[in-house]
């Protein structure tokens, strides 16, 4: 079976510890008006949750939702407290190449050399400013 993947489409999710950073990243990526194009020419952007930082959730549940979306979407972003849990869970899926990144340099290397399609971040270690730079690198760095 051949699956058709939508170019520059993204599914984003987090556990309860990553909600604030996920919301920041999501809000950064969507256009301010209907006429404004999305940043990085995103054709589809799906927020799979969670939406409440006070309600604990098992991160594998969110990873499963992003993994399902990546059957037809090109990119995924996963956020938890450290980034390690979502990375390990994501890499269990055969169509996912995930890396836990903490710097823009990490993202660029992972895209260039490993062709990651899922960026994982730890909300306890990545600032909003660094996350913004990492997202930009994720969508603008090509595999060599």
For the regions a protein language model found, what residue spans apply to each?
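A short beta-strand-loop structural module common to alpha/beta enzyme folds
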Residues: 38-59
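Generic secondary-structure signature for well-ordered alpha-helical cores
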Residues: 30-35, 43, 68-72, 112, ...
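Short, conserved beta-strand edge motifs with alternating hydrophobic and charged residues
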Residues: 13, 45-49, 76-80
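Short, solvent-exposed amphipathic alpha-helices that sit
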Residues: 20-32, 36
């Amino acid at each position: 079976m051949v699956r058709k993947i939508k170019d520059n489409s993204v599914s984003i999710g987090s556990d309860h510890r990553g909600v604030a950073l996920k919301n920041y990243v999501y809000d950064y990526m969507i256009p301010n008006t209907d006429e404004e194009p999305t940043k990085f020419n995103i054709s589809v952007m799906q927020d799979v949750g969670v939406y409440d930082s006070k309600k604990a959730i098992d991160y594998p549940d969110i990873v499963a939702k992003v993994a399902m979306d990546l059957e037809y979407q090109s990119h995924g972003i996963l956020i938890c407290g450290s980034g390690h849990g979502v990375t390990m869970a994501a890499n269990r899926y055969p169509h996912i190449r995930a890396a836990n990144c903490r710097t823009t340099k990490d993202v660029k290397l992972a895209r260039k050399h490993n062709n990651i399609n899922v960026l994982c971040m730890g909300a306890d270690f990545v600032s909003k400013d660094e996350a913004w730079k990492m997202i930009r690198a994720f969508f603008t760095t090509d595999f060599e």
